[in-house]
C-alpha cells in the first residue's frame, strides 16, 4: 500500500509494474 513516484507517473500501470 505504498505510493512510489512510479505509481504517480504511470498510474495503474505503474502500480502493477511495482507489484511485479
Curated annotation (Swiss-Prot):
GO-annotated biological processes: tricarboxylic acid cycle
Catalytic reaction annotation: (S)-malate + NAD(+) = oxaloacetate + NADH + H(+)
Keywords of the record: NAD, Oxidoreductase, Tricarboxylic acid cycle
Binding, NAD(+): 11-17
GO molecular function (one): L-malate dehydrogenase (NAD+) activity
Record's keyword annotation contains Cytoplasm: no
EC number: 1.1.1.37
Classification via SUPFAM superfamilies: NAD(P)-binding Rossmann-fold domains
Job of this protein: Catalyzes the reversible oxidation of malate to oxaloacetate.
Family (UniProt): Belongs to the LDH/MDH superfamily. MDH type 2 family.
Name the record gives this protein: Malate dehydrogenase
Organism: Kibdelosporangium aridum
Gene that specifies this protein: mdh
